[in-house]
Amino acid sequence: MKKELFALKGMICYSKNQREMVFMEDSYVVCENGICAGVFSQLPEEYKDVPVEDLGNRLIIPGFTDLHLHAPQYAYRGTGMDLELLDWLNTITFPQEARYADLSYAKKAYSIFVDDLKHSFTTRACIFATLHRPATELLMDMLEESGLATMVGKVNMDRNGSPELQEESAQASAADTRQWLEDIKRRYDHTYPILTPRFTPSCTDELMTELGKIQKEYHVPVQSHLSENFGEIAWVKELCPTSRFYGDAYDMFGLFGTKNAESELDYTAASANSNSCPTIMAHCVHSTDEEIQMIKDQGVYIAHCPESNTDIASGIAPIRRYLDMGLHVGLGTDVAGGFSLSMFRAIADTIQVSKLRWRLMDQNLAPVSYTHLR
């Protein structure tokens, strides 16, 4: 494979860690096969002959990672803000996602989504597709061509959907998921599969059992939703009465992080360790103390989605508490609960809603500031 190597010159800004920002004027960042090989005030001898694009005094920053968004929902972003989660799903989301059974519609809608994502400041993303395997593979093909680094999930749901948006059985859902994973095996360089049970109310115990087996068989990460809305949490308790809390309804099937976790959220790490289950859970707005402890112990990543949590009135997650506890927290736009792909907006929203939580709900928990979001 031909080696791709080039350098950018300009004002470089990046964070070494949460507390240390680096600013370098008139400096170079070297890119090798899509990965940053280093940042230098002067080009080292080994890179002296690489092509350089001089950007003058323009700012060069790392791309953002959007930890949670729904590609099929981009077509109707900004609608349904008068509804809460469950009504929003039934009234708007499920009927719209059913349209992706039509590949011609999926191609048109996903083309717009991928193009807009490519021209945003996001370079990595964890993405929900729909339950439709052909449309999901189409989306992955488009994302691969875009050059973005993504994880994409074919959604699983065998209950509480709609006649047009529900898989016929747990066995059918599991079989289609296995077929999807086989179809895309070794097909992409920077587009990866991620197992995607929509959320507990959409998946029977039988399906969750099958997904647990698939996770161990294929060593894929997992993404889903957790403790987003009071009505959702109560519903999970009705559907899974033996679960101690919402997260336990995933954990009992081996779909909630890694016991004694120390691993990073890395697809290759998941592949190398048969006991590893890197997991992203979106929202965690109303997580109990016991659930939070399991999130910490098992290395589950929280995708904080402040715009969505505001738009559909879910609440304000205690993000400062999670950060102080050392939990893994990232940001998501959660389109179309959120209406914008802008991660700059997600950063600003995180700070704003954290201040509102401090002022209106809990003055013992300080708000976050930009220093927490580097």
Regions found by a protein language model. Give the residues of each.
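Short acidic/histidine-rich active-site segments
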Residues: 222-229, 312-314, 320-346
